[in-house]
From Swiss-Prot:
Record key words, sorted: Ribonucleoprotein, Ribosomal protein, RNA-binding, rRNA-binding
InterPro entries: Ribosomal_uS8, Ribosomal_uS8_CS, Ribosomal_uS8_sf
One GO BP: translation
Record note on quaternary structure: Part of the 30S ribosomal subunit.
Upper taxonomic lineage: Archaea, Thermoproteota, Thermoprotei, Thermoproteales, Thermoproteaceae
The protein's name: Small ribosomal subunit protein uS8
Assigned protein family: Belongs to the universal ribosomal protein uS8 family.
Disulfide bonds: none
Organism of provenance: Pyrobaculum aerophilum (strain ATCC 51768 / DSM 7523 / JCM 9630 / CIP 104966 / NBRC 100827 / IM2)
UniProt KW Iron-sulfur keyword: no
Length: 130
């Protein structure tokens, strides 16, 4: 089976596991972008421990879920966003100010929209979570 967007697949696996009330989600297949996105989610308290298992087929992550995710999803297409436009995208994808995060891939790595605004850099929108 060919995966066209590994990050989107990972986010949907997390969302489905949260909906049915599971305590953990198995993310497979994985890549570095998925890992860095999971680290941002972990930093903001949306997921718990992230464990990598090398199964000889590309590996997989076991993510501990904390039950704090109401909605999570990829942003497709991946829009380029300038520093000054982040607030507009925040209003479009998040339910209210100060609730949830946008995940942005920047030249300085994958980070939340909050960090991107602090550093005054833009990037490409990857996902939203609240």
């Amino acid at each position: 089976m060919v995966m066209l967007d590994i990050l989107s697949n990972a986010l949907i696996q997390i969302k489905n596991a949260e909906i049915v009330g599971k305590k953990q989600a198995v993310i497979w297949p994985v890549n570095k972008l998925t890992y860095y996105t999971l680290r941002v989610l972990q930093r903001y308290g949306y997921v718990g421990e992230i464990e990598y298992i090398d199964d000889g087929k590309g590996g997989k992550y076991i993510v501990q879920l904390l039950g704090k995710i109401n909605d999570i999803g990829p942003i497709r297409p991946r829009y380029p966003v300038k520093y000054r436009e982040i607030v507009q995208w925040e209003q479009k994808f998040l339910p209210a100010r100060q609730i949830g995060i946008l995940i942005i891939s920047t030249s300085q790595g994958v980070m939340s929209h909050i960090e991107a605004k602090e550093r005054k850099i833009g990037g490409v929108l990857l996902a939203y979570v609240y």
